Amino acid sequence: MFRRRTAALTAPLLALAATMVAAAPAQAVPADKPQVLTRWTQTAPASYTQWADARAHRTKWSAYGFDWSTDYCTSSPDNPLGFPFRMSCAHHDFGYRNYKAAGTFAANKPRLDSMFHADLRRACTRYTGTKKKSCDALAWTYYQAVKRFGH
């Protein structure tokens, strides 16, 4: 008798629990996601620093649903002639992927490409003389490539 009563109560309770789980509201993306994305995709050094810190601590930002994936500098060298362009490319990819997901890529592409150029130029500041000129020239070339062919 006890087993029948337990079995009779178990099925409805399981069904109720499943319904409650299915009916639980999905986590909403924070309302300030566009502002955070904009803040992290500016030409200023602070913008890059904030993005790099967030990238290093992605789990803190998981509710925002940002796309952190990157192929770095795509088919171009990530560190041409030893110049450290890899993270500038990752920052650029972050901007492209997330503005595409937001449906506002075309309006933001010029700024994202300028941000990329600013990041590359900052990567060149550690050099002097001919080496700096070479780095700046490569930064300009990478910038022109994304400006013209980036999509």
Language-model regions, residue ranges each:
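Extended terminal accessory/targeting regions
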Residues: 2-12, 20-151
